[in-house]
Amino acid sequence: MTLMLTLGTAVFGAQKTLPSGKDTGSINVTNLKPGDTVTAYQFVKADYNEYGFTGYSAINNYVKDPVAPTAQEVIDMASSAATMTVAAEKKVATGDTEVTLNGLPVGYYLVMVTSGSETVYSPMIAGIYYSKSATDNTLTNGAISADSDFEIKAQKCWAK
């Protein structure tokens, strides 16, 4: 009887950590060249209340739909990136081909790469987001391959 009560307490006593504004994640950008500089600008943030995560909202109206930016919105943000707040920036070290931007709040980011060589990169987007249910603070971190094509709402885009 004692063993059953102890096991029951362990199972029922475990509590999930609710999503909160303190949650952070990372964006990993691969297939870069040494000397490239990766800069991330947050354009969508996560919203919370006392019960946890409530959804996403656009920062400064950069996008109409926070979870479905259009290709034109990405182009417009890239054109005005100089006016946006830098969330993180990191230079690719000699001998490396990737960078990881850590400690970023949950949300979506415009990622720009300034080339240290002759490579030209197009603007990219990445997200740090909760699971669909958002019942705990488990995050999916952003990942971008800088030399891959991608689509936004079925419109072809190119990473470089």
Model regions and ranges:
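Structural motif
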Residues: 28-34
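Structured interaction patches on ligand/partner-binding surfaces of diverse proteins
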Residues: 14-21, 93, 108, 115-158
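A short tyrosine-centered beta-strand micro-motif
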Residues: 97, 104-113
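Structural beta-strand segments of beta-rich domains
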Residues: 23-27
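Sec-dependent N-terminal signal peptides of Gram-positive bacterial secreted proteins and lipoproteins
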Residues: 1-13
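Hydrophobic core positions of the immunoglobulin-like beta-sandwich fold
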Residues: 29, 101-102
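Short, acidic Ser/Thr/Gly-rich low-complexity loop/linker segments typical of extracellular
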Residues: 51-99
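Beta-strand signatures of extracellular beta-sandwich domains
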Residues: 37-39
